[in-house]
Structures are given as structure tokens and as C-alpha cells.
UniProtKB/Swiss-Prot annotation:
GO terms for biological process: cartilage development; negative regulation of ossification; osteoblast differentiation; positive regulation of transcription by RNA polymerase II. Residues 29-53, 314-349 are annotated as: Disordered. Glycans are attached at N115, N139, N171, N216, N459. Disruption phenotype: Adult mice lacking BMP3 have increased bone mass. Targeted loss of BMP3 results also in increased differentiation of early osteoblasts precursors into mature osteoblasts and further supports a role of BMP3 in regulating adult bone mass. This is Bone morphogenetic protein 3. It comes from Mus musculus. Residues 329-339 have a biased composition (Basic residues). Coiled coil: none annotated.
Amino acid sequence: MAGARGLLCLWLGYFCLNLAQGQRPNLHLPGLRETEPSDRATGGSPSPDLRPHDKVSEHMLWLYDRYSGSSRVQATRTPGSQLPGPQPLRGGNTVRSFRAAAAGTPQTKGLHTFNLTSLTKSENILSATLYFYVGELVNISLSCPEPQGCSHHTQRQHIQIDLSAWILKSNQSQLLGHLSVDVVRPYRDSVSWLSKDITQLLRKAKQNEEFLIGFNITSRAHELPKRMLFFPEPYILVYANDAAISEPESVVSSLQRHRDFTAGTGPRLDSHVREALSVERRKKRSTGILLPLQNNELPGAEYQYKEEGAWEERKPYKSLQTQPPEKSRNKKKQRKGSHQKGQTLQFDEQTLKKARRKQWVEPRNCARRYLKVDFADIGWSEWIISPKSFDAFYCSGACQFPMPKSLKPSNHATIQSIVRAVGVVSGIPEPCCVPEKMSSLSILFFDENKNVVLKVYPNMTVDSCACR
């Protein structure tokens, strides 16, 4: 027993001595860390909570949160994870992701192919970046030749990654260009994901209408591990400016064409990304349930109303449901199992007259009305990732003479309303209630090749209305 204790003490002493000299057992598991988009990658702390195969969907969802102003940025980030800093759109409105369609085989020697046919003629490439995983290569190949010198963190190791781009045709392959990435990292630090700007290569391929390209990733001094040829796959992000996005029905032409998607056959996001999306949707539903018909408020101009039928025949307050009085709420707390019907509002005659006068003056005037669009209602929910619905609003109401300043009439609309009121010229309609200011909407969706795309569509939400 005494001998065993002595051996244990000797082992612990040797272990502590190694730690004091800067040596430690190899307990490191290569994590995943995204570096800033550049030609030189520096080391950083590993992030084992991020899985390599999540990178494309997580990267695109992070960009969606970034450019849409979503509050879900923190929800999608796992503890300790670090995502790349945003690349400016530079006047663009589109971000396309392309995942490697096929990993390397013994015949192609590690060639990763990309199908870029989703790029349209109207999309001008602003920048393009190739992201590829080299964690195993760096962690395996960078060994310390002199253990005593490796204790100094200032010593850096260098490794060069070569990239060769190929245009793939049916009968032959044509070299598109050569690139290299110089990896610089301190000893014992981890570099897992690298990035390389490939803007000029993709512009050249698009100009020549060559949309099937391949990348061969090699190292001059070390052979790539076989696992790196298959998993995780590299991916490409393309920032573009779609010149046709402001044309009439552009949102329909770019989204409605994906009707070949069928339920259950489309691509799926990773589980933690889907959970983050569902949490955000539950928050939106919980904050929007108290509409005027449920909280005993008179409907205002922000909410929907119908134009059908004569104005005098409408009785919008007849079936409004009120909140139960205080006594009723106390009774409901005492009898949780009992079912109580909502009470109907009982207005006196003076209140009803005041409400009718308010309804006659305000809702008839030009104003913004509430409209919520659910993509499931129009059959687009299969390929739209986020948002599943949005507040579009619409403009409706009269622009009668005299028009108040609150309706913001144009000079032409003012003259037109005067001519119509005087009746000098017959058949002149009153000015129209139209959107004055509108805002854009970011939509994250799958394209026809099941790649994740982010587009910022202009003029999707009405901010204010005016008479024109």
C-alpha cells in the first residue's frame, strides 16, 4: 500500500513539473471557430459547442438577424460561439450561400464542386468568399519540434493552404485560377475555419456563363486527412446586388417559382437553429394577441375594416367582447374549471352616437390600416425560412375636399379635389389614398437548388399613407 502511494505521489509530482515547464497532456479537442474574412488566419480559442455541419445555416441565420434587426441574435448563438463580423452589403440586397454539392473522391483528389446556377443575370456580384474547414490539418500537422521552446506563446507556426479553382464541363475541366492562404497561429491555439476572397474568380465564371465550379484544397507540406475530404463541407457566400428586385412583381417572380417544393422533401435546418426560430415566433404571437376586439378598445385607423355595404348599416360594436369585470375575474379564479361566456358591450345612446361620429370622421379618411400577411396562407411557407409572417399594412379611406394637412395631400391632389368639389369638369375622381413611405423586408428562403438565400425586398411594409 505504501509503495502504491509512493508511485502516485511521484506521478503527480512529474505531472506538475511538466505543467510548470510549459508542457501539458494532449487533451485538446479541435473545435470550430470562424475567423474574420481575410487571407491570413490567426489563432483563437476553440468553440466546441458549435458543430461544423451547422455552419452554413447558422451563418445565414446570423446574417438575417444582422440585416433585419431581429432580436434573435443572442438566441441563435451558443455559449462561447464566435461568428464572423458582417461584410457590408455595399449597396447590395442579396446574400446567397452555396454548399459543396459533392465532396472529393479518389478520382477527383479532394475536389469540392459547387452549383452556381441560382445566380441570375440581374445579380451583380459584389463580393464572394470561400469558407473551408482545416481544423484537423492544422492540429495534426503543427507539432512542436523543440518542447522547451514551445512554452513561449510568442512563437508562431506557419502553414500554407493552396486552392485551385476549376470550371467543370461535361467532357473536360478547365483551370479557373490558383489561390493560397497563409495560416499563422501561436502554438497550441486552434484554427478551424479559414476564408478566402474569390470575388474575381466567380465574376469571371459568371461572365463566361460557367456555373459549375470545383475547388481543390491542398497543403504544400502536409497531406490532407481523408476525413477532411468528406466532412465538413466548404461553402461559399456571395454578396450581390439584384438590379431587378425593384421591378414590378419581383417578389412574386423570385419566391413563387419554388412551387416544386413538396411537403417533407425540402431541406431542413439544424435542430438548434429551428428551435431558435420557433422561440422567436412564439414571442411574436404572444405580443400580438391583444387586438382591439379582445381588449375592449374601439378599432382605430391602424386596424382592418371592410368597405362593403352602406356606412349607415354597419354596426361594428354590436359583437365586441369586453374584458370580464373585476368581480367576474375573481369568480373565475375561484372556479378555474368552469366555462364563462364573454359579455357583450352595452353602450348607452350617447356613447353609441359619439362612436358613430368618430367612425364616420376618422376611418373614412385616408389612413394606414392593419394587415398581417402569413406566407402559409399564400402557399409559400414550404421554402420561406423566416419570417413566417409580417405586418404589411395597407392604405384606405377617402381624400375628400377639404383635405386636412394630416392626410399630406400633394399639390396635384389638392387641385384635383377642388375641381371635383366644384363640379366644373364631370367624371373627375377624388384623389387616391396611397402609401407615402414604405420600408423593406428581409426574407430568408431556400432557392430552387435548396441553398439558403437572404434577400432584402424594398417597399414591403407601409409606414404612412397620403392622398395623391
